[in-house]
Each structure stands twice: as structure tokens, then as C-alpha cells.
Amino acid sequence: MNKYFAICPRGLEELLTEELRSLGAQYLKTTHGGVHFSGDWTLCYRANLESRLATRILWFIAQAGYRSEDDIYKLAAKQNWPDHFDVSRTMRVVTTAIKCPLKSLDFVTLRVKDAVCDTFRAKVGERPNIETRNPNVR
């Protein structure tokens, strides 16, 4: 079972929770700006296609505590990115945070991008291209 986060406009979280529940989502947790939930890939697709309230569905790949940008790099580098998308696909890393203790989210974004590219280079021998306007993977 996968973990997801459905983003919605503020004030609609409770309605989104009920909508996701009606689609079959489990372990729902309402928070500011969205709803955490669990389910299979079919549910993820249904939520993306049928939700009238969610603006985006995010898939949790990993989660851990951190103290520095290096901790985030190490967590991102542990993921087997070639299992998630092909090196021929273009990518973009987007970082958002609330009350982040780190100095620069732009630097965090670069470190995550570096970790993904370094993992591809180590496992596949090449890295994906970066496309900031219209990437295949974000």
C-alpha cells in the first residue's frame, strides 16, 4: 500500500477527506492544505481523475528526519531512481517547505537533483536531462 498526499485549496480539506474516503482511501489524515492517505495505484489514478477538490496527488517515496542538506542528499541518493523512471525522461525537482530550518530551499533543490543524477550515473551510466518548463517527471 502506498502513501499519498492530496493537495487542495485551504478550507476544503474536510471535504477532500470525505471525497477520498468515498473513493476508497484509507488512513486519512487531514492537514492544512491537503490530506494524507493510503491506497493502491488504482486509487491514486482514480483520485487524480475523479477528485473535484484535489489539485495534485503526490506519492511519498521516502520520509526521514534531517539536520542538513547533506542528510536530504543521502536520503534521496538511497532511492533506486531507475525503478521510478527511465533515464531518457526529463526531470525537474521542486522543493517546498513550511518553517524549514535550512538556509536555502534552492540549495536543497540542487542537492536532491544531484542525488537523483548521481544515482542514475552510478546505476545506468548516464543521467537524466533537466527541463524546468515542461519535464516528464517532477
PLM region descriptions:
Residues 2-137:
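Accessory substrate-recognition/RNA-binding modules or partner subunits associated with SAM-dependent
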